[in-house]
Swiss-Prot record:
Gene3D superfamilies: Winged helix-like DNA-binding domain superfamily/Winged helix DNA-binding domain (1.10.10.10). InterPro entries: DEP_dom, WH-like_DNA-bd_sf, WH_DNA-bd_sf. It comes from Pongo abelii. SMART domains: DEP. Pfam families: DEP (PF00610). This is DEP domain-containing protein 7. The gene is DEPDC7.
Length: 511
């Protein structure tokens, strides 16, 4: 009997990753060990689509890293778009478990891994603050100075199967335990590649469409203008321009100082300096206190400079002012979850550079607002000072009252780890539309089922009757069991109920 390794090799996984090598009508369900293919496809997608770059983690800079929430977004979109499991809903929590499995099998690792200890199992975090790095394998020539190479998806699968402490069918068993069984339908096809322009336009259109589902807007002008705008392609990092400037040395000195200090406050503040003009950075560098251990003076200098810059520039969320009102109204009414999703959609409409700048600023605000951090003013609370200084840097909406503005800013600070995630509902909407485009169908025809589903008149009548009856029974039970009502009041209410709904009354109390 062929081993799992031989069967995995027979699938020729590396070739299958290219749409050009997939035969018409290809289905995961038609392949033996379909879960093996799915795992390898997930690894390939994660390696090729997640943004890997130099990032800061635990007060140090690390090369070639990606954040946990973006990994979840990439895999989530890939699973839904490729219809591996038919039309079944895949909760984000399941995708987090998939990421945990990939980390357990050393596809990627947390940064830095030593903080977990030798015997403690690392836990994957769906967060924009958790960093991960793809694992490397020692090359035979590594001792001679050659750089280690990443596993290819096929070699990952091969290495996973060959691990001595993993059972031969462990990947299949793990996949089954996730309750995500591959669909048996022969119509599940791997999607073809769409152009980035089409994908960006679909994301833009569906983000706005979903936002309209959540926020009641009096006018649509701002959203329509946003929809007409062409989604911007991420621009080159500003650092490439700085490298050629005479002020690069000052920025380098500040970053080196930050790296030498194990202080989250300083790390977050100096990350924000990348968006300040060169002249301000030079002033900060030249104004540093002579005693390097006086971090209190350094923090005061940095906070004043960042606050001064953002108090004089255009607000980062100056677009879609009507949406600000809608989100604030949701917060006033206690609808926090809906407000969070609406905020995520609003930030999704930001261009790449503004989104990254806002993420850094919001992170710095959250750290600086912590009462256990550096005291910004002796007689005032850190949280209120941060809100007062940076509110106009975020939102400056004349149609939004001061109370609602403060509520919105504090909400953003409190949820800064979550507001940059992409909602799962939007993932599914976009995936459904992209699949329709790929299959040559009308992309707008089937999108409505996400929000509502057409049913027969008879089913509607039956559901209405059943729901009404259940609610009347609940009302009757509430009256009967309410200990706060006097006997006279209860008798009166029960009499009124019997007069209007005798059949419900008899069903509950009997003859």
């Amino acid at each position: 009997m062929a081993t799992v390794q031989e069967k995995a090799a027979a699938l020729n996984l590396s070739a299958l990753h290219s749409p050009a090598h997939r035969p018409p009508g290809f289905s995961v369900a038609q392949k033996p060990f379909g879960a093996t293919y799915v795992w390898s496809s997930i690894i390939n997608t994660l390696q090729t689509q997640v943004e890997v770059k130099k990032r800061r983690h635990r007060l140090k800079r690390h090369n070639d890293c990606f954040v946990g929430s973006e990994a979840v977004d990439v895999i989530f979109s890939h699973l839904i778009q490729n219809k591996y499991f038919g039309d079944v809903d895949i909760p984000r929590a399941k995708v987090v478990r998939v990421c945990q499995a990939l980390m357990d099998y050393k596809v990627f690792e947390a940064v830095p891994t030593k903080v977990f200890g030798k015997d403690k199992k690392p836990t994957f975090e769906d967060s924009s603050c958790s960093l991960y790095r793809f694992t490397t394998i020692p090359n035979q020539d590594s001792q001679s100075g050659r750089v280690n190479k990443l596993y290819s998806p096929a070699r990952y699968a091969d290495a996973l199967f060959k691990s001595s402490d993993i059972k031969s069918a462990s990947l299949e068993d793990l996949w089954e335990n996730l309750s995500l069984k591959p669909a048996n339908s022969p119509h599940v096809n791997i999607s073809a590649t769409l152009s980035p322009q089409v994908i960006n336009e679909v994301w833009q259109e569906e983000t706005i469409g979903r936002l309209l589902q959540l926020v009641d807007l009096p006018l649509l002008d701002s959203l329509l203008k946003q929809q007409e705008a062409v989604p911007k392609v991420p621009q080159p990092k500003r650092q490439s321009t700085i490298v050629n400037s005479s002020n690069y040395l000052d920025r380098g000195i500040l970053k080196a100082y930050s790296d030498s200090q194990e202080d989250e406050w300083l790390s977050a503040a100096i990350d924000c300096l990348e968006y300040l003009p060169d002249q301000m950075v030079v002033e900060i560098s030249r104004s540093f206190p002579e005693q390097p251990d006086r971090t209190d003076l350094v923090k005061e200098l940095l906070f004043d400079a960042i606050g001064r810059y953002y108090s004089s520039r255009e607000p980062l969320l100056n677009h879609l002012s009507d949406v600000h009102n809608g989100i604030a109204e949701l917060l006033v009414n206690g609808k926090t979850e809906i407000a969070l999703e609406a905020t995520q959609l609003l930030l999704k409409l930001l261009d790449f550079q503004n989104r990254e700048e806002f993420r850094r600023l919001l992170y710095f605000m959250a750290v600086a607002a912590n009462p256990s951090e550096f005291k910004l003013q002796k007689e005032s609370d850190n949280r209120m000072i941060v809100k007062r200084i940076f509110s106009k840097a975020i939102v400056d909406n004349k149609n939004l009252s001061k109370g609602k503005t403060d509520l919105l800013v504090l909400f953003l600070m409190d949820h800064q780890k979550d507001v940059f995630k992409i909602p799962g509902t939007l993932h599914k909407i976009v995936s459904v539309k992209l699949m329709a485009i790929q299959n040559g169908r009308d992309p707008n025809r089937d999108a409505g089922y996400i929000y509502c589903q057409r049913i027969e008149q008879r089913d509607y009548s039956n559901n209405t009757e059943k729901t009404t009856k259940d609610e009347l029974l609940n009302l009757l039970k509430t009256i009967d069991e309410d200990s706060k009502l006097s006997a006279k009041e209860k008798k009166k209410l029960l009499g009124q109920f019997y007069k209007c709904h005798p059949d419900i009354f008899i069903e509950h109390f009997g003859d």
